[in-house]
Amino acid sequence: MGQEDQELLIRGGSKHPSAEHLNNGDSGAASQSCINQGFGQAKNYGTLLPPSPPEDSGSGSGQLAENLTYAWHNMDIFGAVNQPGSGWRQLVNRTRGLFCNERHIPAPRKHLLKNVCGVAYPGELLAVMGSSGAGKTTLLNALAFRSPQGIQVSPSGMRLLNGQPVDAKEMQARCAYVQQDDLFIGSLTAREHLIFQAMVRMPRHLTYRQRVARVDQVIQELSLSKCQHTIIGVPGRVKGLSGGERKRLAFASEALTDPPLLICDEPTSGLDSFTAHSVVQVLKKLSQKGKTVILTIHQPSSELFELFDKILLMAEGRVAFLGTPSEAVDFFSYVGAQCPTNYNPADFYVQVLAVVPGREIESRDRIAKICDNFAISKVARDMEQLLATKNLEKPLEQPENGYTYKATWFMQFRAVLWRSWLSVLKEPLLVKVRLIQTTMVAILIGLIFLGQQLTQVGVMNINGAIFLFLTNMTFQNVFATINVFTSELPVFMREARSRLYRCDTYFLGKTIAELPLFLTVPLVFTAIAYPMIGLRAGVLHFFNCLALVTLVANVSTSFGYLISCASSSTSMALSVGPPVIIPFLLFGGFFLNSGSVPVYLKWLSYLSWFRYANEGLLINQWADVEPGEISCTSSNTTCPSSGKVILETLNFSAADLPLDYVGLAILIVSFRVLAYLALRLRARRKE
C-alpha cells in the first residue's frame, strides 16, 4: 500500500466506490438513509450470541468454577481537568465556602467515555482496540472497578455479570486485572513470587502443600519452568526475566485462583512480535478453558488479529464496532471504508479511527459517522435490548465466604514477613552495600580520632567523634530506608488495593524483617570505632554506647519510614528528608548548648533524637571520670577538672540517662505509628 493510498485512507477517502458514502458531505441524507436501511434490514455485523460452552477444565485453586458473561451499558465516564494552580484554587474556594455564602461552582470535567456498551462471553477473547487516547484503559479500569482518583463513572452506567448488577467487592472475587505496568519485588525469583501470591490469594482453607501444587501447575501451564528460579530483576538496574517472561508471570499471579474473568491492559506493550504472539496465545488458551478474557491492544499484527474472537473498536471515547474480525471487514466496507487487499485490518481500523494532526475536524467528523452508524445497527439495538431487560443466563454463585481477604491475618503477616526477609537478604543495596559502607566509615572515623587521650584537646575530639556517631547513623539509615521502602510502595499500593493483605500486616512484617539489619549495622559500627577512638573502657560502657547507637539507628529508620509514607515519590522523600533532619540536629547539644535553646523552640528540642542520644553517650563517657584523670597540658586554656564539669558545661545531668533511653524509645514508637497512619491514609486514598 503506497503512501498516497495511506494518506487517502487516513483522510477518510478510498479507492473503492463505496467510500463515497462515508466522506461525501454533499450526499448527506441519501447516503445516511442507505446506510441506515442496510443496517436496519439486512445487515447484522457483529453478533451477541455467545460461543459454544467450553468444557469444564477444573481446578484445585478453590475458586468458583462458573462461566461469566460480562456486559456493560451506558458507561459515561468523566475526568477532572487539570488547570494551572488548580490545587491552590481549590484550597481558596473551600476556604471561601466556609466563611462566605457563595454559590459553589463545580470543577470542569472532561467527558472521557460516551455511552459505551459491550458484552464479553465465556470462552471468547475480546480485544479492545483503538488509537492512543481512544479510552481503552479508561474503559478497562471502569470494568475492573479500578478507576483512579479524579475519574468518575456515571451512576447510570451498568456493569452486569450474568445479567446481574455487580459491585466492586463481587468483581474482586471473580475478576483478575493485569495492568499494563508489571510491578514486582525484583530480588525475588519467579517461583518465590508465585508462592507468596498463593499464600495471600488462595482461600484460607487450603494447606501449604495444596498452594505449592497449584503454583507448580500454573508454572507448567504458562511455560515458566525454565525461569522459575531466575530473579525477576529490575529493568535497567538488575538483570532478570525478559519482558515476555515478566508478562507471563503477571498472568500466573492472577491465574493462581483460576478466576472466570480476566482483564488485561496492554499485555503486549513493549514486547517484540514473537513475544507478543506468545503472550496472546497464553490468553487464548485461557479463554478456551471457559474464561472470559478482555484485553486492550494498540496495533496487533495480522497473526495476532486472527487470534481474537471478537474486537471492540473505540474512537474518541465511543464504540465504533463490536463483533468478530470478519464482521468488522464487512462493516467498514459497508460504511465506505473498505480495507484494501493484503493489508492488515488492525492497522487499517486504527488509521481510519485516528485523529490526524492538522485534519482534526475532518477526522472527528469521520469518526462520528462511523460511531453513529454502529449505534443504529441491529447489533447495537440488540445489545441495548439485552442489557435493558437484564436477562439472566446463569445466576451468580455465591462466594465461599464473606471474608474481605482470602488469607487470615496471621497468614498475611507470615507471607509478608517471609517475602520481606527474602528481599532483605537478596537486596544488595540494603545488605552488602550497607555493611561495606558502615565498615569503611567506622574505620575512617577510627583513624581520624585514633587513640584519643583525656586532655583538653582530647575532650573536644571525643565529643566531636560521639556526635559523628549520631549523624552517621541518622543519615545512613534515613536515606537507605527511603531508597528501599519507597521503591516497594507501588507494589504495596497495588496489592493492597487488590485486597491481598492488610496495611498493618504489611507494615509490621516489613519492619520486623528489616530489624536484624538495623541491629547489625550499629553493632558493626560501634565494635570498630569505639576501641579505635579510645572511648571509656569497660564492658558496661561499651554496651551502653551500643544500646544508644542502636536506638538512634532505629529512630532514624522510623523517621525514614515516616518520610517515605508521607511522600509521593522517592525524589520527593529524598528532598524533604534533609531539611527536616537539620533542625533536630541543631538541638543535639553539639552546635547549640542545651541551655541556650529559645523558649519558643524548646518543644522542638524534645523531638530531637540527637539531644537524647548525645546526652546519653556523653553521660556514658564522662559521668564517672574523677578529678585528676583529665590531663591539663595547656595553661592558657580552660581545662575541665572532671567529667561532671564537662556535663555541667553542656547543661547535661547524669541523672537523665534513663530519661534519654525512654525518650528514644518513645520516638521510635511515635514515628512508626505516624508512618503507619500515613501509609494507611495513602492506601485509602487509592481505594
From Swiss-Prot:
Broad EC category: translocase
UniProtKB keywords: ATP-binding, Cytoplasmic vesicle, Glycoprotein, Membrane, Nucleotide-binding, Pigment, Translocase, Transmembrane, Transmembrane helix, Transport
The protein, known as: Protein white
Effect of mutating residue 589 to E: In cf; 70% decrease in drosopterin (eye red pigment) levels, 36% decrease in xanthommatin (eye brown pigment) levels and severe defect of copulation success
Subunit structure, as described in the record: May form a heterodimer with bw/brown. May form a heterodimer with st/scarlet.
Record flagged with keyword tRNA-binding: no
EC numbers, comma separated: 7.6.2.-, 7.6.2.6
Family: Belongs to the ABC transporter superfamily. ABCG family. Eye pigment precursor importer (TC 3.A.1.204) subfamily.
BP GO annotations: aminergic neurotransmitter loading into synaptic vesicle; biogenic amine biosynthetic process; cGMP transport; compound eye pigmentation; eye pigment metabolic process; eye pigment precursor transport; gravitaxis; guanine transport
Matches recorded under Pfam families: ABC2_membrane, ABC2_membrane_7, ABC_tran
SUPFAM superfamilies hit by this protein: P-loop containing nucleoside triphosphate hydrolases
Gene: w
Record's keyword annotation contains Membrane: yes
Segments on the Extracellular side according to the record's topology features: 441-460, 519-531, 590-644
Glycosylation sites: 636
Membrane topology: Multi-pass membrane protein
Gene Ontology molecular function, alphabetical: ABC-type 3',5'-cyclic GMP transmembrane transporter activity; ABC-type guanine transporter activity; amine transmembrane transporter activity; ATP binding; ATP hydrolysis activity; ATPase-coupled transmembrane transporter activity; guanine transmembrane transporter activity; L-tryptophan transmembrane transporter activity
Compartments, record wording: Cytoplasmic vesicle membrane
Membrane-spanning segments: 420-440, 461-481, 498-518, 532-552, 569-589, 645-665
Induction (free text): Up-regulated during aging in intestinal stem cells.
Disordered: annotated segments: 1-30
Residues annotated as domain ABC transporter: 93-341
Gene Ontology CC terms, in alphabetical order: cytoplasmic vesicle; cytoplasmic vesicle membrane; pigment granule; pigment granule membrane; plasma membrane; presynapse
Reactions catalysed: 3',5'-cyclic GMP(in) + ATP + H2O = 3',5'-cyclic GMP(out) + ADP + phosphate + H(+); guanine(out) + ATP + H2O = guanine(in) + ADP + phosphate + H(+); riboflavin(in) + ATP + H2O = riboflavin(out) + ADP + phosphate + H(+); (6S)-5,6,7,8-tetrahydrofolate(out) + ATP + H2O = (6S)-5,6,7,8-tetrahydrofolate(in) + ADP + phosphate + H(+)
List of residues binding ATP: 130-137
Phenotype caused by lack of the gene: Eyes are white due to a defect in color pigment production. Malpighian tubules appear clear or white. Loss of st/scarlet protein in the pigment cells and retinula cells of the compound eye. Transport of cGMP, but not cAMP, is inhibited in Malpighian tubules; however, basal fluid transport rates or rates stimulated by cGMP in the tubules are normal. In Malpighian tubules, uptake of guanine, xanthine and riboflavin is impaired while uptake of hypoxanthine, guanosine and adenine is not affected.
Domain of life, per lineage: Eukaryota
Lineage of producing organism: Eukaryota, Metazoa, Ecdysozoa, Arthropoda, Hexapoda
